[in-house]
Amino acid sequence: MMGDVWGEKDTRFAFIGLAICSILGDINRIKVEPIVEYVEKCMNYDGGFGSSPGGESHSAQVYTCLAALAIAGRLDIVNRNRLSQWLCERQTQPSGGLNGRPQKLPDACYSWWVLSSLEILGNLHWIDASGLASFVLKCQDEENGGIADRPNNRADVYHTCFGIAGLSLVKYELDGHTLPEIDPVYCMPVDVVSSLGLSHGPSGWKSLLPSHWL
C-alpha cells in the first residue's frame, strides 16, 4: 500500500489505512483484498513479515501485518506456530528483553511489537513474562520518570508508551494494582476501543480470530 505522493510502499501503511477506516466506521471505503494480497507477499519462510516483498522479517512489521490482517478478517493466511516461534526467539538472555530481528540488542519498544503479535496469535504464554517485565523496569529513569530503549539511556515518550503497553499485556502488577488492559490490534485501552464501537463482537478483538485458533 502506498503511503505518500512519492510512492513509498510499506506494510505499515496497510495497517494505518485499515485502522483509520475502521476507526471512522467506513472500512468499505478502502479496497481490502488488494491490501491482504500485498501483505501476504511480504510473508517470509520464517513466518515473519518484512516491509515489502522479500524484505527481512522484523518484529514491528509483524505487528502491523497481523493487525492489518485482523481488521481485514484474514488472519487465516498466517503460519501461526512458525511465526510464534520466530517471535519467541526475539527474547534475549540474560536481559529478558526483546529485539526486532536476529543478532540485535534488546529494546523496550519491542515489548509492544512482539507481545501484541503473540497475544493476537494466542501464544503470549510462550514468552518469559517476568524476565521481560524486569528488563522494561530497568529501562526506567528513576529520577525523572519515563522509559528508555535500554537501561541507562535517555527516556522518551515513544519507549515509555510501548514499554507500558508491553507491561499491560503481561499483566504486570505492583502493590495489587494492574495496568488497564490494552487491545493488541489497535494499541488502545480496551474500554476506549469498546467506546469507539471497534470491539467487533462480544469477545472483543478475539472476535477477529479464525475460529480454529480459539
Regions found by a protein language model. Name each.
Residues 68, 73-93, 103-214:
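Terminal, non-catalytic domain-edge segments
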Residues 4-61:
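Solenoidal tandem-repeat scaffolds enriched in leucines and small polar residues
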Residues 2-11, 49-59, 97-109, 148-156:
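Solvent-exposed loop and edge beta-strand segments that line ligand/cofactor-binding
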Residues 36-103:
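Aromatic-anchored, glycine/proline-accented short structural segments
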